[in-house]
Amino acid sequence: MNKHLRQICMGLSLLLLLGSKLNLFAQYASGGSPLSLSLVERTQSLRSLRHDDTLHLDAPSKATLSEWLQKDKQQTNELRPFHFAVPIATQIRLGQGQWTQTPNGEHIYRLTIKASGAKSIGLHCSRYIMPEGASLYLYGSQGTLRGAFTAQNNSESHTLSFSPLPGDWVTLEINLPAGISPNQVDLQIDKVYYGYKSFLDLKSTNNSARASAVGEPLYNYLETGLERLSCAPNIVAYPEYSNQARATLLLIAEGAYSSTGVLINNTRQDGTAYVLTAAHNINRIYDEDFISETPNDPKTIEKVREVCKSIIFFFGFESPSKDQDIRGSEEKTLSGATLIAYDEEHDMALLEITGLPTNAQGIRSIPASYNPYWAGWNISREPQGPFFGIHHALSSTKRICIAEDQKIHLYDYSINKGYEYLNRDISWKQAHWRIEEWRLGTTETGASGSPLFDGNGLVIGALTGGQSNCNNPYRDHYYALTQAWGGEHDTRDNIFKLAPWLNPDNQAVSKLSGYDPYSSKPVQRLSPFYGEKTQGLMKSYQAQEGVSGQGRIITLSHDTDVLGAYIQLGRFSLSQAEKPNYLIELSPIEGGLASSTPIWSTRLNNYNFIRYNRKTGEMKEEERTIGEDEVEVFIPSLANEKIPAGSYLLSIRTTDDSKLDYPLLTTQYRNTQKDYQQSTWAKSIGSTWSKSNTLGRSLWIDLLIQGDKQNGNGTPNIPNPEQYSAYYYGGQLYIQNPQGEATAQVYDLIGQRYTEVKLTEGENIIPTNSLLPRQIYILSIKGTLGSYSIKFRP
């Protein structure tokens, strides 16, 4: 299988269907549910909405589908998209549906689009303009709901794509509050994407429900993805690279191509949402049916511009645990981009995100809850290492790879061999940096466009391709910024250069530091668990009779804005209809008791992402795949609120005071049972909150805040237990021995001992570069405080 280009072509994986009465946040949607679903049940005047107009579309001919299926068979598995849908050109207007007015003056519009035999239906809006207060929802034949899409989804291009819904029909519903006229809505659908393959085409033989929905990050691609990335650590294990990690994004184009990009700074440092990636991520991997024989042909560029409108950008898709794979939050997404710069001669592409919501000051910007960072850059021809890369290989959670080289060189690079579908020579002369060997980690398919950083954390290139993997971590090629930079600004060919955009005022600089828009008012995740070693400590919550809620005490040392909350879900197989609504609340502690009136609250009843529908060209909200993986969900604040300093109970409870019976992930503090009793609280059914003497574990709920830096991680002032800790980095073992005597020993997996060191109190650093050949080892520590061990690989 050819593995040069590091982009993954996403297929229609197993879609775990959630229920229809679920609010859906994703891309940037405000949640809620369609007005008709609630009003139909309680008012006779809207019964006609059950019989809304249906638009029947002709399915593609058998010859057309046969042609696509035959083409699929001829494509390579690694470099070509998994085609699951074909577009049907349409001219759907609002006049083809039905408007109804409620007794309260609200307007409801519904139109059902049906394509017999389709495995999925997707939409693309060539015109999308929603007035303030309007909400648009989509729901399908299998109970899937997306929305609400609102005026915040309006963009300068006035287009929007919605990811496909399973089944052969989809209903579009628009809700307008009283006082808003239907004439203020402008909606036109020019493409419907007819899914001709079902999720069974990629379903593995063991019938696991771990695959992803169409257009969703694959996470564990074909159930081997996590294993293939076993040598590439979760980025949270390396907090020293947190800024660069904040800048690195997962991209999904046309609902089918998954890759990586990086938010990149410009010399005006104005927060322009530029994203650097690889050209082949947005030109269908130099497909002869897409690109012209002439490089950078204007016709190709126009096609690429259309692809950019379909891109979904995922922020912060990463595991919150160092050692355990948890499917990261998918709720922080933005959709749509415009093409800024593009050059096939270097495989370079620069995009600008267009689907930005409007903040409280009326400015379109990336939300603070996404915690963005704009990476700096270095166009020197002699950058200094050590070099490292951050990526979303295999469309999975964010990973890191590190090389120890101090210098790097330019090489020729070609991808022609084994690519029968190319219509011209695809090679580059002295355009690519080459990483000879990754000392830690690897890239993989899906890492295309990911940034390569120098020793100062500045971007020097983006990944084009290579053949590295965990067993062969060698020779990856990144196009060099210095080669793709371009000379003097010239409006005639600025699209082929980076310089006019990243250095718009033509300043005499070759390096630029990163940009943190929230450095004076940082975004902070309050958590005693985030990034900690939690392997073996996490398990699903065991429901307790008579308990309707659980929480833990947090302390805020300064006034702060609450942006939202994270919660970790364990594995489960309940249908969405069986999942009750939950409230996440922050309640003041007064006189040792939790106030019955929370100061802040948000609702957990949905988990969504945004997807592009190739048939319709629209963006749609999709319910996340929830099932066989531990999953992190981000629940945004309905409105940012200022919270004063003090002690609070951060809790989750059922809305109807029924038993808390849900596979929420729990973990334990590294403290004593007495400390559990001080920090873990429970709510009894029909009663109030009180300290728990029996639970012994805490639900993993974290608060996301913005403001002055908090002292600590929000945990109450309870002494942490004395225990050993250790990690491996850069050829050295770093070991903390809080007190007493201790000995560290290193073994291989067959029990052969390589070294033994007596530890002093405090930090101990043990070099291992010349000591250990490359393989997996066990560090074992024994001493006054007991025993401790970790696995590591030099």
What is each residue range found by the language model?
Residues 262-272, 441-463:
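Catalytic nucleophile loop of clan PA
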Residues 27-108, 157-163, 168-265, 515-546, ...:
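Protease-domain processing segments flanking chymotrypsin-fold serine proteases, especially trypsin-like
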Residues 515-591, 647, 654-710:
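Beta-sheet-rich sandwich/jelly-roll-like modules and their strand-loop junctions
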Residues 165-436:
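Serine endopeptidase catalytic core focused on the charge-relay Asp
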Residues 440-441, 449, 575-673:
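Aromatic- and Gly/Pro-enriched, solvent-exposed loop/edge beta-strand patches characteristic
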